[in-house]
A protein has these predicted regions:
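Alpha-helical transmembrane segments and their helix-helix packing motifs
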Residues: 1-265
């Protein structure tokens, strides 16, 4: 008989997250802000790198940016930051397995989302006013990414959101279940690289790029960059991310491991 490491990891994660949230919402908020900030740091560096390399080889920034961005999510998982998109998998699986209530899952996800956004806004403001972003224009890499995303229909944003969080939680499950530290890192980087390269929609990643552009000198030149459209985009992305990470990754893995003692993860 073999016990499921997946279930034990989910139970531990749910208890840890619920305990911190219940005992100190301030500490939980800080961990959530770190996640939003870490992604903003890697977004900021990747976007400037993309602009520079595009001057040497036009179009090559599309390949560089995802690689640099991916480190931000690696920082989050290795440094115990609270990222809403991975929590969608952990908490949905935990609720199905009765390790945490559905109500508490919804409450933590919304709280985590809010402080992922606040972390991204603070870091985004800082980068937007830094020397690297002093001359940002409509033609800059990050401006193009934000404008492209805001021009998408709800149906496309939903699909891209689903795909993004399947990739993200492939990374998270690899981090949780694989033993070797080096293998964990490369599996995380590979999955994150892929969703960013494909321009899929990830709510916290969008907090990062949108925040940098919103506070920058280029903000007024971005088409459809208004609060109602931004909130529309984020809302649909959140739903897509929940479907991908919670319903298509967390729930199936919880079902596959429940009441099993042979073929388990």
């Amino acid at each position: 008989m073999v016990s499921s490491e997946f279930i034990s990891k989910i139970e531990f994660a749910c208890k840890k997250k619920e305990s911190l949230y219940s005992q100190s919402k301030f500490k939980y908020a800080i961990r959530s802000m770190f996640a939003g900030a870490f992604l903003t740091f890697s977004t900021a560096a990747g976007a400037i790198g993309a602009d520079l390399i595009n001057k040497i080889a036009p179009g090559s920034g599309r390949f560089l940016f995802p690689f640099v961005f991916a480190w931000g999510l690696a920082y989050s998982v290795f440094l115990n930051a609270e990222l809403v998109t991975s929590n969608m998998m952990f908490l949905t699986a935990g609720s199905f397995l009765k390790k945490i209530s559905w109500r508490k899952t919804a409450e933590i996800l919304l709280y985590c989302t809010l402080f992922n956004l606040i972390g991204a806004l603070i870091a985004g403001w800082g980068f937007a006013h830094s020397a690297a972003y002093a001359n940002l224009t409509h033609d800059s890499f990050i401006s193009g990414v934000v404008e492209m995303k805001l021009g998408r229909s709800n149906e496309l944003v939903l699909l891209e959101g689903i795909l993004a969080n399947i990739f993200v939680n492939i990374a998270i499950l690899s981090f949780v279940l694989v033993k070797d530290g080096g293998a964990k890192l490369w599996l995380v980087l590979s999955a994150i690289y892929m969703f960013v390269f494909l321009t899929n929609e990830h709510i916290a990643a969008n907090f990062a790029s949108f925040a940098i552009v919103k506070f920058s000198v280029a903000a007024d030149s971005i088409a459809n960059f208004d609060i109602p459209n931004i909130l529309r985009h984020w809302g649909v992305t959140f739903i897509g991310n929940f479907i991908g990470g919670g319903l298509l990754m967390g729930l199936p893995y919880a079902f596959l491991n429940k009441n099993e003692d042979t073929y388990v993860d």
